[in-house]
């Protein structure tokens, strides 16, 4: 018979097939969504024979120029990337950088999809949430606005002005707490990433952006004559490497030793200098 009908199940055959196809598509979509949560990007500097047998340290990162970004060769670059590579080399570890959805970082850390977070991340306000290395870098937080803006100082940030910050950042916490020399009436807009903050400033959705000075200096250099930093030193923030609070192992101890030595011998300072506005690294411009 040409009738697509199953007398035993009383379900049309085409309906059964459609259900199977729909279910298969649902599985594929679920798999794709899961895959999009994080992406492992191979690192050319960590694929030689000498380190193939080293323990792998899965480092969760997200795009945050100049700390983490993908260069013109498709490899990771940035201040935190270079510091992590050198620290892992000294600690006898093989770094594997995992591009993550930053909002999903805690779940990935707890599930073991990543071992740590190393991406311009501060223990400030989060001391008890993670198991931290000792701070390896102290950064200065500043504020940038368009040159055409009438904002020339923090005193100009009143209730009529809007300031962008990254959601969950120390800058956001301090602004909400009202313990900076900024009017508590200033409007705060929180965004999920540095890139979104940049876009909001470019489109005029906000009047200024508060972030660490390395990021802001890069923005000013990338768009000559468009932006200016008007508050050079709002506060300083320490950066560290965050492991799950229940972590047990030697990695933190070994990384602390490596990072201490890198600070003492000037390696960290040289890496940071490589990424200052206008600087080049390895013959290539440090461009996002």
Language-model region placement:
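N-terminal hydrophobic or amphipathic helices and topogenic motifs
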Residues: 1-96, 267-288
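Ligand-binding clefts/hinges and TM-proximal coupling segments of bilobed small-molecule sensing domains
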Residues: 32-43, 97, 170-192, 223-224, ...
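Acidic, polar ligand-binding/catalytic clefts
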Residues: 41, 81, 85, 89, ...
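Short, Asp-centered acidic motifs that coordinate Mg2+ and/or phosphate
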Residues: 58, 111, 115-116, 207-208, ...
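Bilobed "Venus flytrap"/periplasmic-binding protein-like clamshell domains
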Residues: 58, 62-66, 74-89, 121, ...
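Periplasmic-binding protein-like
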Residues: 62-63, 126, 137-145, 213, ...
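Short, solvent-exposed loop/turn elements at domain surfaces
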Residues: 66-71, 126, 173, 250
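Extended ligand-binding regions for polar small-molecule ligands
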Residues: 81-90, 148-151, 155-171, 241-281
